[in-house]
Structure formats: structure tokens, C-alpha cells
A protein has these predicted regions:
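Short, Lys/Arg-enriched N-terminal segments with co-localized hydrophobic residues
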Residues: 1-5
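Conserved glycine-rich beta-strand-loop-beta hairpin in the small C-terminal domain of fold type I
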Residues: 283, 300-308, 320-333
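N-terminal small-domain helix-loop-helix segment of the aminotransferase-like
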Residues: 7-98, 105, 285-288, 394
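Conserved core segment of the aminotransferase class I/II
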Residues: 52-53, 227-301, 309, 391
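PLP-dependent enzyme catalytic core of the Aspartate aminotransferase-like
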Residues: 336, 345-353, 360-394
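Conserved active-site segment immediately N-terminal to the catalytic lysine
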Residues: 198, 215-238, 258-264, 352, ...
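Conserved core of the PLP fold type I
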Residues: 63-193, 210-224, 228, 232
């Protein structure tokens, strides 16, 4: 949108606000007070349209049972059409309190205990937890990594599907932590055709769909056509607009038989809807948050280019994966830190809270860290300078 910008991007110091990223480090790191670059939420105030909508609802003074307005669905439908060229129908949309909850439920709906479920590692670690916690057989097909450039090993992917009689594939699109925005031929001619041939269900986690840079373009999995009977996608306003605490996401199910399976499951568990504040926040964000998102993407891009340039100059053998999408930077530090010393060096010497590589699929990724760039330039500078000051060539 051209003209005078009314929206501003406001950094918020979230320390001492019951913020998990800054105030909840004890559980994952065994201590507090680290410089936080881990949990995937932002340190930016949300769009003013969200604040205004929530303020108006709060000031109504009544928070009883909530009827979900058509405008909630329409705001999302309009967003998908305008930003991704994809026409979603209201009757396809189901509620989940979060993308993670959604794929946990879908695991239970679409598979049985001990069924094999495949993922592309390194991958968002709740995928791994979901498979294990639901007593399914976790199958990992590693992405190919050529000096930080990630691609799909389709031969390995298909072989593991056939060898293990895989029943379900959980796709991360865009991919966390590798930062890939998959091209249409990769998902359709690759993943989806293989899954069709072997009767494998697909859950497509598209929570980072709006966080895409440069000429890259997110392809909604369901927009590729022909796979509705084996595919469900999950999206949310939470990553895009920094409202994860509102606990509101959308499960998109075009196929009537899959809708029936989902509906029967949630009725049996009496999870029929979310809380009113989540609906209000998500509706407002999708309806009015576009200008704010543009500012966020510009800031993340600036932060990434700074990190990339500084490390190229000061730690030239660190491999920074290209950031096509997400605001999460995946960095290989094996030239400077032994994998078994990574946590000691990064946490104790650098005093950083990052997501450690082994969380994303095991020891073979222990030389990596994932850093969250959805924060102020100053915070990124602190993190980068801590790495430069404490890492030396092995």
C-alpha cells in the first residue's frame, strides 16, 4: 500500500512480562538471564488494529460464550486469496488452539499406534515429539545439505516410505529450520506424487506462510489440486502477527470424508472452539495487519543481512543457510565449536539462549544453532557479537 504509513514497528523489551522466551529459560537451559534468540515469536508490538479490537472487546465487560462471526472466516479467506492466490471455502475451516495441537490431533485421527510417520530432518522438533508421544514410528528422511543450501532427497524419501510402509507425512512449508520456501515442482511433482503413489496422508504445517522474502513465493499445499483426499493443511495468524498467546489456528480440510473424521474426533474430545480473544485478535490481524507485516519483513531482512555480512567477515567458516522464509536463521558452526561442546560454548560463554541443532533431529545436527531474527537490530547485534567474541577456529 502506497502513501503515508500510519503503522509503526515498535520493539518491546519483554523481560519480566511472563514471556516464555525471556522469562522461561529455566526449563530448557537450566538457568535464567540468557540473551534470548530462541522461541519463535517476535519482540514487536502487534498491529494496532489487533490492540484496538481487543481493547474494544475487553471494554464490553462481558466475556460469555462466543458466536464465531462470519467476518472471522472472511478475513482469513480474503487474506489467503490476496496473499497466496488460493480460494478457501468457509466450510473447509476447522479450529485448533494451535498448529502443534492440530497435528497432534491429526496424527491420532489418520494413523494408528505403531504406524510409521515420516518427516524431513532437520525439522521443527514438536514434529518429532508428536510422533513419539503418540506411539508412532518416527522415520526421518534428511534433507540434502550442500554448504548450507538445502534440497530434498526424493530417492531417500520414497525408499523410506516403501521400506517402512509409511502412513503419514508431516510437511513443514516453509521449512523450519532450513528456511526453504518449497517450489511448486518440489511439493507437487515430488512430495505429493510420491505420497499419492503410496497412499500416504499429508499434514502440511504452513504457519510461516506469510514470512517469505525476495522473489520466493509460498505455494499453499492444497492449492496444487488433486490431493484433497489425502491432505490437510494447518495455518495460523500466530507467527505472522505475533499472537501465539491467543491460541487460534485454522485446520483446512476440503475433503468431506476427512472432515467427518476430524469432526467425530473433536466431538469425542469436546474441543469444539477456542476462546473469544483469539478469534477477535486473528480476525483483526487478517483484516488490517498487512502494512505492519511489511514493516516486520523489512526488519527481519535487515537483521538477516547484517548477521550474514558480519559472520562472513568475522567468522568466515560459519555457514549461514539462505533465508527464503521464516524468521529463523540456521547456522553451522562446526568450524569453530565441537558438537559436544556447543551448548557449553553458546550458553555459558556467549550467554545466548538459542535453539540447539540436536533438538531438530539428533546428534548429526549438533553443530548447528537456530537464531530468531524477529527482534530489534540491537538484539541481533548483541547475539552476533557474542558469537564473534567467543568463537575461535578449532
Amino acid at each position: 500500500r502506497r502513501g503515508i504509513r500510519m503503522e509503526k514497528l515498535v520493539y518491546v523489551d519483554r523481560r519480566n512480562t511472563n514471556c516464555n522466551k525471556w522469562d522461561g529459560q529455566q526449563k530448557m537451559f537450566g538457568e535464567e538471564g540468557l540473551h534470548a534468540m530462541w522461541v519463535a515469536d517476535m519482540d514487536f508490538r502487534v498491529p494496532e488494529c489487533v490492540v484496538s479490537a481487543l481493547r474494544e472487546y475487553v471494554e464490553s465487560g462481558v466475556y460469555g460464550y462466543y458466536k464465531i462471526p462470519d467476518a472471522y472466516y472472511q478475513a482469513f479467506i480474503d487474506w489467503e486469496r490476496e496473499h497466496h492466490g488460493y480460494e478457501v471455502k468457509k466450510e473447509w475451516i476447522r479450529f485448533s488452539p494451535g498448529v502443534v495441537a492440530g497435528f497432534h490431533w491429526l496424527l491420532q485421527i489418520l494413523t494408528e499406534e505403531n504406524d510409521a510417520v515420516i518427516v524431513n530432518t532437520p525439522v521443527y522438533y514438536p514434529f518429532l515429539d508428536a510422533v513419539k508421544n503418540n506411539h508412532r514410528n518416527l522415520i526421518c528422511s534428511d534433507l540434502k545439505n550442500e554448504n548450507g543450501e538445502y534440497s530434498i532427497d526424493f530417492d531417500d524419501f520414497e525408499k523410506k516410505i516403501t521400506d517402512h510402509q509409511v502412513k503419514l507425512f508431516i510437511l513443514c512449508s516453509p521449512h523450519n529450520p532450513a528456511g526453504r520456501v518449497w517450489k511448486k515442482e518440489e511439493v507437487k511433482s515430488g512430495f505429493f506424487e510420491i505420497c499419492r503413489a503410496h497412499q500416504v496422508y499429508i499434514i502440511s504445517d504452513e504457519i510461516h506462510q506469510d514470512l517469505v522474502f525476495g522473489e520466493n513465493k509460498h505455494i499453499p499445499s492444497l492449492s496444487t489440486g488433486e490431493y484433497d483426499d489425502i491432505m490437510v493443511s494447518i495455518v495460523a495468524a500466530s507467527k505472522t502477527f505475533n499472537i501465539a498467546g491467543a491460541q487460534n489456528s485454522m485446520v483446512i480440510i476440503p475433503d468431506e470424508k476427512l472432515q467427518e473424521k476430524w469432526d467425530a474426533y473433536v466431538k469425542g474430545n469436546r474441543v469444539l472452539g477456542g476462546n473469544a480473544f483469539g478469534y477477535v485478535a486473528a480476525q483483526a490481524a487478517y483484516a488490517g495487519g498487512n502494512e505492519w507485516l511489511t514493516l516486520v519483513l523489512d526488519q527481519i531482512e535487515e537483521n538477516y543481512q547484517y548477521l550474514k555480512a558480519e559472520l562472513a567477515e568475522k567468522l568466515p567458516e560459519a555457514v549461514v543457510t539462505p533465508l527464503e522464509g521464516t524468521y529463523l536463521c540456521w547456522i553451522n558452526l562446526e568450524a569453530y565449536v565441537r558438537a559436544d561442546e556447543m551448548k557449553e560454548v553458546i550458553q555459558k560463554k556467549c550467554r545466548l539462549a538459542v535453539d540447539f541443532g540436536d533438538w531438530f533431529g539428533g546428534e548429526r545436527f549438533a553443530a548447528f544453532i537456530r537464531m530468531n531474527l524477529a527482534t530489534s537490530k540491537e538484539n541481533v547485534e548483541i547475539g552476533v557479537n557474542a558469537l564473534i567474541a567467543n568463537l575461535v577456529r578449532k
